[in-house]
Amino acid sequence: MPQKVLYYEKRHKEYMEQRMEISLRPITEDNFIDAFNLKLAREQERFVSHPIRSLAQAYVYREQCQPFGIYQGERMVGYVMVIYDYDVPEYDVWHMMIDEAQQGKGYGKAALAQVLAYIGQKPFGDSGRIALTCNRDNAKALALYRAAGFAPSGNEDEDEIGLVLNI
C-alpha cells in the first residue's frame, strides 16, 4: 500500500510541475501568427479546426469567448478556445490542439488543467457545466478528456462524441 501512495504522490507532483510550466495566453495581435503556424499531423487534420477558422469564430463570438495560445515557457505549443453558451448555459472547449512537434510531452494534459482552472473562475457567466465534442476516432484526445473526468453527454453524430464535465 505505501508504494501506491508514493507512486500517486510522485505522479501528482510531476503533473503539477508540468502544469506550472504550461500557461494560457490570450491570442492578440502580437501572437496570432504563431497560432496560424501551428501544425497537426496530416491524419489529425480532420479532428480539429485550424486556429485560422477558430479565430474567425472568436471574432463573431467575441463577447462570450476567449482564444488562447498554449505556451511552454515562451513558445506557443498549442491552441484552445473557451466559449460561453448563454442559451444553455455552459462553457464549451473548442478546437484544442497541440502542435505535432510538441505532442507526447504532456502539454495537452497540462493545458486542459489550465483551461479547467480558467473556467472555474466563471469569466463569462455562472455555470458548472463544461462541454466539448471530440472526433470518435481521436483516441488520444478521448483518453485525455475521460481522464480529466469528462463523460459522454449523449450527444453524438456520425463523427463526433459529446462530452461533459460538471464542476
Would you name each region that the model predicts?
Residues 110, 114, 132:
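Active-site helix adjacent to the Tyr-X3-Lys
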Residues 99-105, 136-137:
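Active-site acidic-Proline motif in GNAT/NAT acetyltransferases
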Residues 21-95, 99-101, 112, 118-124, ...:
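Acetyl-CoA-dependent GNAT
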Residues 69, 162-166:
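Short, well-ordered beta-strand micro-motif
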Residues 109, 136-154:
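Conserved active-site alpha-helix within GNAT-family acetyltransferase domains
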Residues 126-142, 158-161:
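Conserved beta-strand-loop-alpha-helix junction that forms the acyl-donor binding cleft
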Residues 2-30, 166-167:
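Conserved N-terminal entry element of GNAT/NAT acetyltransferase domains
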Residues 106, 124, 149:
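Short glycine-rich hinge loops at helix-strand junctions in the catalytic core
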